[in-house]
């Protein structure tokens, strides 16, 4: 997605670009409960690979864990989506794909962005049984939550903002969320300085 931002001050456009990378929340696997893993991959490597799978993100029905009213480490139906991954090879080598990750309960639109992402290969007799906990997070905490890439460039005397999604959200939704975040931060900054001004006026009176 490419947007003409020639009429927007560069520092505002750059702020939006930074929010795309750092602040727009997306959903990814945060925790993996290993029930059984006899695959060639260690628990740590398998968990890491799963955490990098983009999940279609529902920003309208889920909260960031730190903002959820449950305030529980385990989470609730408003801040965590539980998935399971059960796979076993019997008489031949199989490849386990992201399509094999199934929701434990109804997950709405939340699902792996693509079903064709390979997770692990299993030889006959090997199996994996896992529980996955998918939560909202931000790119500034870990790159697995980075919504996409964003860059500013100039061409033919005009300035453009280019956004490419990793699959969590559509580019247009990413842009809308980034703009909302910039607006909110500006509002918070204004409130902060207004309080400082008010406090200074009271001290000088």
Segments (PLM) and residue ranges:
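Protein-protein interaction/assembly regions in multi-subunit complexes
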Residues: 1-205
């Amino acid at each position: 997605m490419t947007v003409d931002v020639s009429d927007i001050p560069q520092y505002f456009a750059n702020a939006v670009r930074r929010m795309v990378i750092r602040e727009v929340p997306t959903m990814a696997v945060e925790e993996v409960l290993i029930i059984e893993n006899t695959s060639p991959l260690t628990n740590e490597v398998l968990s890491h690979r799963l955490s990098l799978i983009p999940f279609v993100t529902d920003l309208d029905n889920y909260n960031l864990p730190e903002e959820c009213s449950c305030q529980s480490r385990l989470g609730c139906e408003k801040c965590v989506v539980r998935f399971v991954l059960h796979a076993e090879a019997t008489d031949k080598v199989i490849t386990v794909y992201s399509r094999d990750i199934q929701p434990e309960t109804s997950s709405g639109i939340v699902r792996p962005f693509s079903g064709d992402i390979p997770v692990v290969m299993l030889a006959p007799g090997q199996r994996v049984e896992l529980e996955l906990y998918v939560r909202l997070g931000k790119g500034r905490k870990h790159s697995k939550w980075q919504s996409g890439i964003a860059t500013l460039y100039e061409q033919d005397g005009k300035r453009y903002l280019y956004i490419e999604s990793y699959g969590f959200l559509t580019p247009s939704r990413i842009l809308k969320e980034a703009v909302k975040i910039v607006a909110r931060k500006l509002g918070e900054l204004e409130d902060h300085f207004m309080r400082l001004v008010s406090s200074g006026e009271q001290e000088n009176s």
